[in-house]
Amino acid sequence: MITIKKGLDLPIAGKPAQVIHSGNAVNQVAILGEEYVGMRPSMKVREGDVVKKGQVLFEDKKNPGVIFTAPASGTITAINRGEKRVLQSVVINVEGDEKITFAKYSTEQLNTLSSEQVKQNLIESGLWTALRTRPFSKVPSIESEASSIFVNAMDTNPLAADPSVVLKEYSQDFTNGLTVLSRLFPSKPLHLCKAGDSNIPTADLENLQIHDFTGVHPAGLVGTHIHFIDPVGIQKTVWHINYQDVIAVGKLFTTGELYSERVISLAGPQVKEPRLVRTIIGANLSQLTQNELSAGKNRVISGSVLCGQIAKDSHDYLGRYALQVSVIAEGNEKEFFGWIMPQANKYSVTRTVLGHFSKKLFNFTTSENGGERAMVPIGSYERVMPLDILPTLLLRDLIVGDTDGAQELGCLELDEEDLALCSFVCPGKYEYGSILRQVLDKIEKEG
């Protein structure tokens, strides 16, 4: 058991009831191009084309052989691009139930699959994109290998779904998925990371290693797991995958069909009935949240309130890796003498307002409660950083773009979500996730 003591469980209102319900029906889904770090698409479809579920939409030019497939059947209604023609989203109006089928196997056959059989089915179905590397958080090259594979079966993000509730319903598919992944690199460890008090189904596999984590957020982040179990570096890579994609892998290999259903948390202070809902990867979030939100100007976030993506316009869809939709109020109203008031209804990690001493949950908004200023090293980062790194020094090097110093201090182990708490507690209001990504891109390009 690994116990995480440094960190923060955000006391945010609107926690979801851990019971699965059917979500609003959606008739539009999309693949979000900017979710895939460094991806440059070679389009295989155009607007107006009718596609089947599992059909190839585009291939990554920079990672040949890695294809992205449709999560549902229907008509391509929009291919949205941003500056420099960066692909933002490929939108599908859902129609019919036509699908492409792939190789399938009996449960008994799964434990005898070759690495090539596993790889081929994952690539052809598009499920290869469920895997990501660390460092750099990219979809792995189909010719590459990993030191190990991590399966994350816990989630400590604010307002997250309890994985054990979801896995209770899909236990056989999850164990089948673990079996398949264990065959990808039979001689390499498959690490299953779960909460210490959770009841997660497992499989009797030779290379499966089970690890229990407990404590405050970020105990449930895969970056935390990798740091304590199999740390990475410039010459060492691991892969990781979330538990719902493991379910999809299990279903793919036993049914021959691409499984794109998601059970997500729909929660936050502005959600009328916070709960777990069934939906589909890439679901239109305006449709999914219709009649679900309190009145007022709200911000819908695909993912966690700490590190998710704003869902609007061409990005108004559930992300490929998102397991929650969070909704908070837009906090753009000015407060008279707000900086000097006791503020019993506001939360602070530095004891600057009375709300710090309260045990209640808070209706957080998008307000940063202050303006941008210089980075101030007052110990805030150290309180929320459980990894064996020096956060203040690392963040300073990230800000000034010192790639050599940042590498020495451990930036290659990190992803945007690993620095989300540092951004939250930062007195200078820096967004360290985007700064980290710029540095990682520079390191990958220049070394």
UniProtKB/Swiss-Prot annotation:
* GO biological process annotation, one example: sodium ion transport
What keywords tag this UniProt record? Answer: Ion transport, NAD, Sodium, Sodium transport, Translocase, Transport, Ubiquinone
The record lists the catalysed reaction(s) as: a ubiquinone + n Na(+)(in) + NADH + H(+) = a ubiquinol + n Na(+)(out) + NAD(+)
Question: Which Pfam families would you find in this protein's record?
Answer: NQRA_2nd, NQRA_N, NQRA_SLBB
Domain of life (superkingdom): Bacteria
Family of this protein = Belongs to the NqrA family.
Record's Gene3D superfamilies? 2.40.50.100
The protein's GO terms of the molecular function aspect are:
oxidoreductase activity, acting on NAD(P)H, quinone or similar compound as acceptor
Species of the source = Haemophilus influenzae (strain 86-028NP)
Subunit info here reads: Composed of six subunits; NqrA, NqrB, NqrC, NqrD, NqrE and NqrF.
What function does the entry list? Answer: NQR complex catalyzes the reduction of ubiquinone-1 to ubiquinol by two successive reactions, coupled with the transport of Na(+) ions from the cytoplasm to the periplasm. NqrA to NqrE are probably involved in the second step, the conversion of ubisemiquinone to ubiquinol.
> Is Repeat among this UniProt entry's keywords?
no
Q: What class of enzyme is it?
A: translocase
Task: Return the protein name.
Answer: Na(+)-translocating NADH-quinone reductase subunit A
